């Protein structure tokens, strides 16, 4: 990957001049000028996903200039480098190959000259065998009972992805009850364990190093809870499995290393649901559905790797995001799924995007002089409409939004889905086109009120519109289509990081807080007054000590 400051390119300067011409342009004008705008600014993937980006503040010229930026920063070479297994995560000297985990074509992918696919396939086969024994009832707990509940203990990428997918694909789940524990707050593990039976509960401890503070604290509490009933440590092996690479620590914990599922340093945590970290997904949905999830992602991988940029969906969405973030000053993007099963999707890509591209040093180690990753947030529709859409519609912030919905519901109750989708369509229309003062007054006039009668309230009913949105309409949310959708967003994030000249696949920003927490923890063991920090931190620690007793 080349290290090119995007803001110093000719394409960036051209975009800056173009922005001056575009900043006052109305989306409504763009539609008025082009009756086929939808056709010109939308694309379908695999006849399963429609991406409509026509309700954006863009023209053909805008996209041409954004594509010029991608060319000048050598995006195509960056894509090739990732798929070729080059060590593009340079700060950790690692390849970035989550695409290998779902490489259903099984073509060789090399890291340091070694094909990784045999190992990938071996772990998949091991997970298939293990999951089939648990799901089928062959795997027994220490009293001979079959497993009814599975608790995944992890944090960050070892939790967010599997939790999101098992929720999104709940219509496909089997009889096993799936639980996820992440927070080191004892309340999380305590509340999760309350209704469970130690005789029928299986724990998955997801930590590559088997040293992650939050995960191992929860794992030891789960082990203590289990042994409080089981008594004998030899029974731990029947109720715990590990998603890890630290065989020594796994064995010392009491887990049979035959039930340790490995992954590799070229798998980043927030891109790891496709790996052994996805074992909870397999146990919830079955291996066949996990394979379909992989296949959908692989199909998007092929699209991303081989489709020209002008028709490449992750590239298009990435470029539009850069346009708003760097030229319009938009600081956030909202992800708004109109599907209740997808209620964790925004949280998943909050980590996916913000941990990946929340960087302020470029690939040369210099401070950036442009915007990098946006703030990502969102909630399912229609709930959000009754919470924060007010600000999106009439506030002073520009918030580009992704609206996501399936055409087919898994729960076709009465007219629920039609009402849901009518809101989905209405919101993007309202955000784009708004409602003028003239229309407001005309509506009042139709109700028999004069302009003078309503002049005190009319300004508050005006919607400026010109709020940009992307609409992603899926035929149905299935393991395959969800896999493709997740990969779409993953590659969007990669594209933005490549163009913005930052390292997308490290996360050094999480380290300082952990270091300081490890330093502070021993200071909390007694009641002595602390004075080794700044006055604020000292004051907080000392008040905590005074109040905890």
Swiss-Prot record:
One of its GO terms (cellular component) is cytosol. Pathway: Carbohydrate biosynthesis; gluconeogenesis; Carbohydrate degradation; glycolysis; D-glyceraldehyde 3-phosphate and glycerone phosphate from D-glucose: step 2/4. One of its GO terms (biological process) is gluconeogenesis. Keywords: Cytoplasm, Gluconeogenesis, Glycolysis, Isomerase. It catalyses: alpha-D-glucose 6-phosphate = beta-D-fructose 6-phosphate. It is found in: Cytoplasm. The keyword Isomerase applies. InterPro entries: G6P_Isomerase (IPR001672), G6P_Isomerase_C (IPR023096), Phosphoglucose_isomerase_CS (IPR018189), SIS_dom_sf (IPR046348), SIS_PGI_1 (IPR035476), SIS_PGI_2 (IPR035482). GO terms for molecular function: carbohydrate derivative binding; glucose-6-phosphate isomerase activity; monosaccharide binding. The active site is at residues 355, 386, 514. Its EC number is 5.3.1.9. The keyword Cytoplasm applies. It comes from the Bacteria. PANTHER family: GLUCOSE-6-PHOSPHATE ISOMERASE. Belongs to the GPI family. Catalyzes the reversible isomerization of glucose-6-phosphate to fructose-6-phosphate. This is Glucose-6-phosphate isomerase. It comes from Pectobacterium carotovorum subsp. carotovorum (strain PC1). The lineage of its organism: Bacteria, Pseudomonadati, Pseudomonadota, Gammaproteobacteria, Enterobacterales.
């Amino acid at each position: 990957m080349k290290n090119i400051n995007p803001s110093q390119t000719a394409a960036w300067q051209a975009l800056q001049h173009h922005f001056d011409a575009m900043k006052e342009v109305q989306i409504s004008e763009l539609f008025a000028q082009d009756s086929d705008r939808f056709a010109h600014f939308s694309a379908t993937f695999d006849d399963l996903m429609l991406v409509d980006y026509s309700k954006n503040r863009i023209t053909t010229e805008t996209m041409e200039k954004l594509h010029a930026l991608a060319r000048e920063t050598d995006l195509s070479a960056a894509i090739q480098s990732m798929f070729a297994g080059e060590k593009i995560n340079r700060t950790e000297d690692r390849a970035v190959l989550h695409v290998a985990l779902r490489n259903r074509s099984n073509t060789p992918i090399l890291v340091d000259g070694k094909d990784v696919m045999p190992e990938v396939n071996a772990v998949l086969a091991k997970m298939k065998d293990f999951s089939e024994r648990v799901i089928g009832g062959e795997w027994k707990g220490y009293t001979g009972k079959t497993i009814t509940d599975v608790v995944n203990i992890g944090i960050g990428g070892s939790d967010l992805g599997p939790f999101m997918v098992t929720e999104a694909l709940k219509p496909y789940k089997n009889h096993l009850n799936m639980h996820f524990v992440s927070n080191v707050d004892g309340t999380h593990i305590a509340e999760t364990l309350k209704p469970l039976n130690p005789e029928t509960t299986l724990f998955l401890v997801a930590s590559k190093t088997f040293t992650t503070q939050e995960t191992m604290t929860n794992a030891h509490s789960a082990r203590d809870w289990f042994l409080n009933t089981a008594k004998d440590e030899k029974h731990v092996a029947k109720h715990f499995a590990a998603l890890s690479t630290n065989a020594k620590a796994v064995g010392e914990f009491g887990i049979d290393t035959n039930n340790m599922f490995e992954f590799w340093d070229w798998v980043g945590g927030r891109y790891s649901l496709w790996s052994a970290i996805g074992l909870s997904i397999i146990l919830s949905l079955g291996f066949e559905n996990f394979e379909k999830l992989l296949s959908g992602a692989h199909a998007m991988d092929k699209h991303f790797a081989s489709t020209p940029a002008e028709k490449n969906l992750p590239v298009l969405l990435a470029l539009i995001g850069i346009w708003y973030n760097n030229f319009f000053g938009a600081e956030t993007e909202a992800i708004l799924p109109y599907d209740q099963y997808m209620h964790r999707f925004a949280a998943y890509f909050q980590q996916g995007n913000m941990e990946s591209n929340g960087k302020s040093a470029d690939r040369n180690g210099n401070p950036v002089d442009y915007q990098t990753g946006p703030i990502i947030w969102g909630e399912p529709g229609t709930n959000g409409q009754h919470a924060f859409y007010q600000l999106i519609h009439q506030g002073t912030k520009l918030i580009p939004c992704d609206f996501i919905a399936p055409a087919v519901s898994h729960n076709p109750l009465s007219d629920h889905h039609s009402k849901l989708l009518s809101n989905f369509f209405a919101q993007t229309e309202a955000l784009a086109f708004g409602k003028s003062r003239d229309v407001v007054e005309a509506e009042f006039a139709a109700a028999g009120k004069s302009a003078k009668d309503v002049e005190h309230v009319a300004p508050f009913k005006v919607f400026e519109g010109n709020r940009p949105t992307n609409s992603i309409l899926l035929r149905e949310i299935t393991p395959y289509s969800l896999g493709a959708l997740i990969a779409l967003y993953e590659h969007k994030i990669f594209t933005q990081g490549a163009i913005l000249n930052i390292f997308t696949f490290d996360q050094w920003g999480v380290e300082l807080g952990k270091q300081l927490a490890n330093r502070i923890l021993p200071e909390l063991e007694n009641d002595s007054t602390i004075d080794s920090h700044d006055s604020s931190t000292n004051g907080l620690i000392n008040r905590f000590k005074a109040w905890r007793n």
